[in-house]
Structures are given as C-alpha cells and as structure tokens.
C-alpha cells in the first residue's frame, strides 16, 4: 500500500516538475527577446521576467523535482529489487541528466538577472525542447519497462527531434521576415520625416533671407 502512495505522489511530482521546466525555459526565450527591445520597454520587461522566473523556479519547478526524487527513493526503499531492472537503471540515468538540466537553467537564470545573455532566443527554443524528449523516453520506459521496443523508440525520438527542429527553423524564418517587413515599413516614414525636416529648414532659411 505504501508503494502505491509513493508512486502516486511521484507522478504528481513529475507533472509539476516538467510543467515548471517547460514554462521556465519559455520565459527564458521571452526574456532574451525582451533584451532586443528599446528602452524603457527593455528594462520593464526584463524586470518582470526575472520576477516570474525566480518565483517559478523556487515555488514550482524545484519543489516538483524534490518531490519526484524523494518519492522515487521511497519507492525503491519499499521495493529494492526494482534496482536490478535495466529499464529502471536507464530511467534513473535520464533523470540524473535532467537534474543537471534543471540546475543549468538556474545558472542561466542568474546570468540573465546579471544582464548576461549566453544564448540567443533560437538557442533557448532548442533548450526548451530538451525536456520533451526526456519526458517521452521516460514515460515509455515506465510503461513498457524491459519490453520497450528500442528500434521503434529510437526512430520515434529521432522523428520527434526532426519535427521540433523544423518548427524552430520555420518560426525563426517567420520572425526574421516579420522584422524585415517592419523595417521596410518604418524606412519610408523615417524618410518622410527627414524630408519634412529638410523642407522646414529650407523654408526658415528663405524667410531669414
């Protein structure tokens, strides 16, 4: 009975942890893009994103990770024979890497709070998809256990990565084209303003003459 309680709260922890990771790095994307904005929008947005990231990391993401790990340990204490299963050993290795990813996000958060941006928005989008791949593989391991079809899983994960890469590239292209259109529409207005200023200056010279 204790095992089932531990398992239930382990699943709750996983849901909370992954939800926090997905949203946290998405905030990183917006934070980096806010750095490209002119003042005062840049400072206002960055300050807001720093507050949101800090609260999300401390109040949701980290507690979710702790609950996941603690409940997993409790499950292993009640049923230590599970440690002999290959699928669980692989799953634990993936979770260890995911914990490293979790702490890497904390490092990026501190860097951005210090106005240091090591990654661009597109790189952040790539980083944001890492938990998706881990989630898929971990869930498949938990469901199929030692019966997981490795060939199908490998091809499926590869297809997922290719699809995510295509989406990221398409969005980057769309964003670049939108910027070019915005710049193109802004140039004529700037030219008109320059012409008006020049005409006003010329008129002033004529009146002075």
Residue ranges, per PLM feature:
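Polytopic transmembrane helical bundles with strong interfacial aromatic enrichment
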Residues: 1-209
């Amino acid at each position: 009975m204790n095992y089932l309680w531990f398992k239930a709260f382990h699943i709750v922890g996983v849901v909370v942890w992954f939800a926090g990771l997905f949203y946290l790095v998405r905030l990183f994307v917006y934070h980096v893009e806010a750095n490209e904005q002119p003042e005062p929008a840049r400072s206002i947005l960055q300050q807001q994103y720093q507050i949101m990231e800090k609260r999300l990391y401390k109040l949701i993401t980290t507690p979710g990770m702790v609950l996941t790990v603690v409940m997993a340990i409790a499950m292993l204490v009640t049923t230590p024979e599970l440690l002999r299963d290959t699928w669980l050993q692989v799953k634990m290795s993936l979770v260890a890497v995911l914990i490293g990813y979790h702490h890497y996000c904390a490092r990026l958060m501190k860097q951005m709070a210090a106005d240091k941006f090591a990654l661009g928005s597109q790189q952040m989008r790539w980083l944001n998809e890492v938990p998706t791949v881990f989630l898929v593989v971990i869930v498949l391991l938990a469901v199929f256990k030692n019966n997981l079809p490795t060939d199908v899983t490998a091809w499926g994960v590869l297809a997922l990565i290719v699809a995510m890469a295509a989406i990221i590239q398409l969005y980057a292209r769309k964003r670049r084209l939108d910027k070019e259109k915005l710049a193109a529409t802004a140039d004529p207005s700037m030219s008109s303003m320059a012409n008006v200023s020049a005409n006003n200056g010329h008129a002033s010279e004529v009146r002075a003459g």
